[in-house]
Amino acid sequence: MAGDHAGDQSFYDFLIEEPEMIAPTPPGQFPHQQPISSPNRTSRNTPLRPESTEIETHHHANHPPALPVLGMQLPVPGTVPESSRAQSRASLNLDIDLDLHAPSHPSHLSHGAPHEQEHAHEIQRHRAHSAQSSAGLPPTGFASHLPPASSGPVSLGWNMYHVPPNLHLNANQFNFEVPGHMNVSGHPTHLEHSSTNPNSFHYEHNIVSPSSIHPSTAHFDGEVPSQWDDSLGHGASTPKVRTPSHHVSSNPWAEINEPTGGDNDNLAPVTRPRKPARARRQKKEPRKLSDASQGARSSSTGGTAHSVSDAASPSSTSHQSRASLTSKSASMTSAASTASSRKSKLRSASRTSKNTLDKPNDTAEDRRTRASHNLVEKQYRNRLNAQFESLLHALPEQIRHGDNGGGNGNVDNESEQANDLDRRVSKGEVLEMARRHIEALERERNQLGT
C-alpha cells in the first residue's frame, strides 16, 4: 500500500506542477473548495467509487468522495491500480475527431472511427447525466470561459495510463455551429495524401477574400497534391492548396512582377515598332553630319559675337540622343537657323525647321503632329521674345550702349552704329541691363532723399 500511496502522490504532484493542466480562472469566481489533501496513509479501507475511471467536471451530489480541483472532479486516490499505470506511463494518446460540417448534429470529441464503437455505450449512458448536472456546474473550470450554445453532450476520450476515463465538459457551452469539415488524427510520422487513408489530414472550407466571394472559387484539399512541396524538414506533411486558374489571375495577393496570361500578349507589340525607327536613325546620320557642317559654316560667317540663344540651339549631338525615341519626339527639335538679321533686337523666332525635309518616310499623321507642335513652340518663342524686346526698348540709350566697354572714345559714331547693327543682344544681357538701370534709379532716389 505504501507504493500505491506514493504513486498517488506523484499523480497529484503532476497535476499541480504542470501549468497546462491548470485552467486560468477569473478572480472572484472560485467557490468555496476544500484544499487538496492526501488520504490517510494508514487506512486500508479507503472507499472506492463505483466507476474509478471517470474524471468529471460536474459538481454532483451523488459523488461526495470526489475532490474539486479548479473545476475538475478527481476521484479519491488509491482507486487505480499501479500496474496499469506502469505499463502505459510512456504513452499518451489524444485523438480528436471534430465533425463541424453538419449543423444539426452536436459537436463531439472521440477517438475517431476505430474507437467510436467502444465508447458509444458510454456516451449514451452519460448523456442524461450531463443534461441533469449541467445546472449545478460551478462557475469555475475549463468550460466556464466558453460562450453558451445549444445543448448536447460532449465527450472526450483521453487514453491515459491505459485507463479509459470520460471527461464530461459542459454540453451547453460546447455545442456551437462552425461551417466546414475538419478531421484531425493523431501524430503519425507521415500522412499519406490518398483517398483510402483514413488518417489523412482533410480540411475543406471556402476561403473568403476580396477576389473570391463565391464559395466555389478556391478551397483547401489535403488529398490532391498541388503547389506546395513537403520540404519543411520535420517529417510531417502540410495541407495542399488547389486554386483554379481564374482565381490566380484575379488574386489581389499575387506578386506584382508575375506576368499573367493577358499581360504576355500585350508586351510583344511594344518592342516591335522600334525596329523601323532604328533603321531611319541609321539613314539620318549622314544628313545630320551635313547639317552640322552647314551650321558651323553659318556660325563662322555670321559674326564673332554669340548669344545665349545660339548656344541653346540644337546640335548634332541632341539629334542623335533624341533619334532613339519615336519620330514624334524627334520632331520637337529644330535645325540650326539661317543667316541672322542685322538689327539691334532679339533674335526672331521665325526660323523654319528642317525636320519637314529630313523625314521623307514619315506618315501624314506624323507630319501633322510635328507641324502642330512646331507651331505651338514658335508662338511661345515669339511671345517671350516680344517681352524681352519691349524691356530692351524701355531701357535708356546709355544703358543699352554702355555695355560695349569704356575704350570706345577713339571710335567714330559711324563705326559704333555699325557695331550696334551687327551686335545681337541675348536675353541674359537684357536682364543685366535692366538690373543696372534699377540700381541707378535707386541711387538717384537716395541722393534726392538726403
From Swiss-Prot:
Residues 368-441 form the bHLH domain. It comes from the Eukaryota. Residues 113-125, 356-377 have a biased composition (Basic and acidic residues). Residues 18-87, 99-148, 185-377, 398-426 are annotated as: Disordered. Residues 272-286 have a biased composition (Basic residues). The keyword DNA-binding applies. PROSITE patterns: BHLH. Signal peptide: none annotated. Gene3D superfamilies: Helix-loop-helix DNA-binding domain (4.10.280.10). SMART domains: HLH. Residues 101-112, 305-341 have a biased composition (Low complexity). Residues 31-46, 291-304 have a biased composition (Polar residues). Keywords: Allergen, DNA-binding. This is Allergen Fus c 3.
